[in-house]
Design a protein with these regions (language model features):
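A structural motif shared across PLP-dependent enzymes of the aminotransferase-like
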Residues: 27-37, 52-69, 80-92
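Conserved PLP phosphate-binding loop immediately N-terminal to the Schiff-base lysine helix
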Residues: 180-181, 212-225
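Catalytic PLP-binding core of fold-type I/II PLP enzymes
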Residues: 222-237
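Short beta-strands and strand-loop turn motifs
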Residues: 45-48, 175-176, 210-215
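Active-site-adjacent loop/helix segments that line or gate small-molecule/cofactor pockets in enzymes
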Residues: 1-32
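PLP-dependent aspartate aminotransferase-fold enzymes
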Residues: 92-208
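Cysteine/selenocysteine-centered motifs that mediate thiol-based redox chemistry or coordinate metal-sulfur cofactors
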Residues: 3-7, 71-106
């Protein structure tokens, strides 16, 4: 185990970690269900599902079987100009369980890249309509959307983790984050009015509104009132 840690220190740069002032690391032996088992024999509850990527738990027999079956055929092929049955079946299934207005599936490899692609879609749409000035984005403060350059530009500009890149990022439009559910029940006018004002004032420049679905995660697990999302959708239309 000590050799693993030593080699890790020598060759690996972990995400969200300093290359010089290094945080402790914990070698993992195996994982099952909601648990991570360390080389030391300790058992941990993975309460964040490995950054939300293992929502069905580790070592799920159905997923393991599907992975083993697929790897014996091919692990990966480029998706430009090619297709294959698993991708088509998954896209069809996603289409069946999402709103009718969402008709196509674009596969991506991370949350950051997914948001980045969505931003490009929005800009490209307005460009096709000859409205090339609509290339900026409106979002709420306290948000987190990813670690690529585009997604950093729409994450919280003051208290977020990307402050040091501020002068390198595109400048976007921000409004205050919405009230808590209880505060929204008492008075929903503030956040919606601010959003409406910004949309009216800057509509000629705004390509899209970007917002985390359901809640602001990294920003404090702040859950949106469902009506806020509904009213925001109406404002955008």
């Amino acid at each position: 185990m000590q050799k693993i840690i030593k080699d890790d220190r020598s060759y690996v740069w972990h995400p969200y970690a300093s290359a010089s002032d290094k945080n402790p690391i914990y070698p993992v032996k195996k994982a099952k269900g909601t648990y991570i088992y360390l080389e030391t024999g300790e058992k941990l509850i993975d309460g964040m599902s490995s950054w939300w990527c293992v929502i069905n738990g580790y070592n799920h027999p159905r997923l393991n079987k599907a992975i083993k079956n697929q790897i014996s055929k091919f692990s990966h092929v480029m998706f430009g100009g090619f297709t294959h049955k698993p991708a088509v079946e998954l896209a069809k299934k996603i289409n069946e369980i999402t709103p009718a207005s969402l008709q196509k599936v674009f596969f991506s490899d991370s949350g950051s890249v997914s948001v980045e692609v969505a931003m490009k879609f929005a800009v490209q749409y307005w460009h096709s309509q000859s409205l090339i000035k609509k290339k900026k984005f409106l979002t709420v403060k306290n948000g987190y959307h990813g670690d690529t350059m585009g997604t950093m530009s729409i994450s919280d500009p003051v208290n977020g983790m990307h402050k040091m890149f501020e002068k390198s990022l595109l400048k976007q439009f921000y409004v205050s984050s919405p009230e808590s559910i209880e505060d929204y029940k008492r008075d929903k006018s503030r956040s919606l009015k601010e959003m409406e004002t910004k949309l009216i004032d800057k509509h000629a420049e705004i390509a899209a509104v970007v917002i985390e679905p359901i809640l602001q995660g990294a920003g404090g697990m702040r859950i949106y009132h469902p009506d806020y999302l509904l009213q925001l959708k109406k404002l955008c239309k």
